[in-house]
Amino acid sequence: MLASRRGFAIAGTTGSALAMLAACSNSHGRGDTQPSASALPSNQQEGAPCPADMGHLEQILAIGSGHKLPEGADVASVTPAVEYTKHNPRGWGYIIAFTATDPAIRQYVTDNTSFSGETIDRNPNSKPGDIQLSDLNFDEISRPWRAGFSDGALVLERPLGRGWLIINGSSR
């Protein structure tokens, strides 16, 4: 009889201890939410294929088709298109700021747009307003020129030297 009481006491103590452990390990009630284990880095937008940073530049340029930079371009920054996503909540985007020589930019325009690189100086200035361009401050770009793509835009400063390649997408 003593053995059965001892077994009962051990079983009861073990059960109580397990119940307490379970309660402690689940400190969140039913209504609480726990942070997602797959939280995105601050430089990656929801639905975007990769973070917006220099380390992922090649992956970003490979999105869609035909994205590249002028020959010999130096990339100054790669940032997420934050303002664009305010206008298009399911969208994501990248802003690639670069510098390149005048001849390289002209050749790039001729090869990658429907415009001639030789005539872009005569084209009118672009104006803000398109949601694809909402991340750029046009007050800081002299004589901006723009060419649109199906999934982005190219904005150049004149005289030529600085540019921004914008790549946009949607998680739909």
For each predicted feature, which ranges?
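Extracytoplasmic low-complexity, Pro/Thr/Ser/Ala/Gly-rich segments
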Residues: 30-96, 100-101
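C-terminal motif of bacterial Sec signal peptides marking the signal peptidase cleavage site
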Residues: 20-23
